[in-house]
């Protein structure tokens, strides 16, 4: 591009222009009818034959003069930064039918390096070698003279960079050096281009547009002027000068920007959907990721959000982690010889006891498929045992439906001032309405019975259906309609304010006690 400048005789700097090249046309000013308020066009730095009548006026010259009096500074970054004030000009005197190319370049104003100290700029040394000059061609080029004279010609998209390997065509500058922008008007050739030796052109320089390139603003007065006049800096207005200066220096540095959606995804991924606390995730659609359980049941995060009728989980006090290992059973509910009705509380009640943290299956699927869990097997073993209490208690891992006789019954549960250490089989909280009187009449029917089926289970059905437990295949089948309301383990009328630390002694084994609302 430097060869291009030499081809049509562009001077390196405006100070090197010879006096004979500085031409001014007074009669053209009279023809334009410029008023006293409009500044006259400065003489062209370089003009060839046929380009004498072209006049250029700097837009917002008063604003440029304000910056020039203080010492204009322009931010340069690796990615490129636009100039403020923007370089805009009004061009007149062009041939309306001739095509022109308008372009800019920025050249060093001198061969010094500057520093800002004691609230002023001073020379600190010799300038660094200048980078090869780049030309910024206006996007509308080439265009007819009528097009250029119709409106302001703006170079606001021009960007300044300090990246010497910049591939985007930005103007490359060195920090702490003074530069002078220049405007070139070139008459397009027959190929709508320029660069040949016969190309006519003229160069216009406005001395009030020179500036020092910086990576952050040095003079707080420049910071204040930029904030007051730049419409994109209105967020900084209203603060004190030093704070504005500090913030502007911070804004000039390049920091990585993390998208909000990524942060929201990271925050939401740290919370399990099976937790006790209710969390409402209001992220974007990218948060609908799949959560896989051990049993192969998959659902989206929206399906796992707890609702008003959802169950809440209860943390295990013993510290043992129970995993959901639901297994399908091939038998139908009607094929079992003996079933004990067992009903859960209504999902509309917010009773925190014996609630599952996993989503309940739909009624259509639960009517044909039954599931059982390890916790249900442990409860069945706990209630069906009739062995004497003198036998040793096995560990939690050894308890299964094949060890009925080895598990002693819960003959009594006493809760004192503090919780006893859980050395044996951990128990779970029950309701405060346990009574021993209602248990004894029914205990005689099952005192001497031992279950022979090792596959007893809970029929895990929907929340509004009765959940039955298989106990003894020799006993008759009891229908849930023939049972009294006092025979359900969790009636719908259980109060919500039940203290988990109130118990009554249970003196029998093998059966779930009854209670009612008045007990």
UniProtKB/Swiss-Prot annotation:
Q: Which UniProt keywords apply?
A: Cytoplasm, Developmental protein, DNA-binding, Nucleus, Transcription, Transcription regulation
By its UniProt entry, which Gene3D superfamilies does this protein fall under? Answer: Transcription factor, T-box
Keyword set includes Cytoplasm: yes
* Bias (Polar residues): 29-39, 262-282
Places the protein is found: Nucleus; Cytoplasm
Known DNA-binding region = 63-238
Assembly and binders: Monomer. Homodimer (via the T-box); binds DNA as homodimer.
Domain text: The T-Box domain binds to double-stranded DNA.
Name of the protein: T-box transcription factor TBX5
What species does this protein belong to?
Xenopus laevis
Q: What is the lineage of its organism?
A: Eukaryota, Metazoa, Chordata, Craniata, Vertebrata
């Amino acid at each position: 591009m430097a060869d291009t400048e030499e081809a049509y005789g562009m001077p390196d700097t405006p100070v090197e222009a010879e006096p004979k090249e500085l031409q001014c046309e007074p009669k053209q000013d009279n023809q334009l009818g410029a008023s006293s308020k409009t500044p006259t066009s400065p003489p062209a730095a370089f003009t060839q034959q046929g380009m004498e009548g072209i006049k250029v006026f700097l837009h917002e010259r008063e604003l440029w003069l304000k910056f020039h009096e203080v010492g204009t500074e322009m931010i340069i970054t690796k990615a490129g930064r636009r100039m403020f004030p923007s370089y805009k000009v009004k061009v007149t005197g062009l041939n309306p039918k001739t095509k022109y190319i308008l372009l800019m370049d920025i050249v060093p104003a001198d061969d010094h390096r500057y520093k800002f100290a004691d609230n002023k700029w001073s020379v600190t040394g010799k300038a660094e070698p200048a980078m090869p000059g780049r030309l910024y061609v206006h996007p509308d080029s080439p265009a007819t003279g009528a097009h250029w004279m119709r409106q302001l010609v703006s170079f606001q998209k021009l960007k300044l960079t300090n990246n010497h390997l910049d591939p985007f065509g930005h103007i490359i500058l060195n920090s702490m050096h003074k530069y002078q922008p220049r405007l070139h008007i070139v008459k397009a050739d027959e190929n709508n281009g320029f660069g040949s030796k016969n190309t006519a052109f003229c160069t216009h320089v406005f001395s009030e547009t020179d500036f020092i390139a910086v990576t952050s603003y040095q003079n707080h007065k420049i910071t204040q002027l930029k904030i007051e006049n730049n419409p994109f800096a209105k967020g900084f207005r209203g603060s004190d000068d030093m704070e504005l200066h500090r913030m502007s220096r911070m804004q000039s540095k390049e920091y990585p920007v993390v998208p909000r959606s990524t942060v929201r995804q990271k925050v939401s991924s740290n919370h399990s959907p099976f937790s006790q606390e209710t969390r409402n995730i209001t992220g974007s659609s990218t948060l609908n990721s799949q959560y896989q359980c051990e049993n192969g049941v998959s659902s989206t995060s929206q399906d796992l959000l707890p609702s008003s009728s959802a169950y809440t989980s209860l943390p295990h006090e013993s510290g043992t982690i129970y995993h959901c290992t639901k297994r399908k059973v091939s038998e139908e509910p009607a094929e079992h010889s003996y079933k004990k009705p067992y009903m859960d509380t209504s999902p509309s009640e917010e009773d925190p006891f014996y609630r599952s943290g996993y989503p309940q299956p739909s009624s259509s699927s639960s009517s044909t498929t039954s599931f059982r869990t390890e916790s249900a097997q442990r409860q069945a073993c706990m209630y069906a045992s009739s062995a004497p209490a003198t036998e040793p208690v096995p560990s939690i891992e050894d308890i299964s439906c094949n060890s009925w006789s080895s598990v002693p019954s819960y003959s009594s549960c006493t809760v004192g001032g503090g919780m006893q250490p859980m050395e044996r089989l951990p128990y779970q909280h029950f309701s405060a309405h346990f009574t021993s009187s209602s248990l004894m009449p029914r205990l005689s029917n099952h005192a001497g019975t031992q279950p022979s089926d090792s596959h007893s289970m809970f029929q895990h059905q929907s929340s509004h259906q009765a959940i039955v437990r298989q106990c003894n295949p020799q006993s008759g089948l009891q229908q849930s309609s023939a049972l009294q309301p006092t025979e359900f383990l969790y009636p719908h009328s259980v109060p919500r304010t039940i203290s988990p630390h109130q118990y009554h002694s249970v003196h029998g084994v093998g059966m779930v006690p009854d209670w009612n609302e008045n007990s």
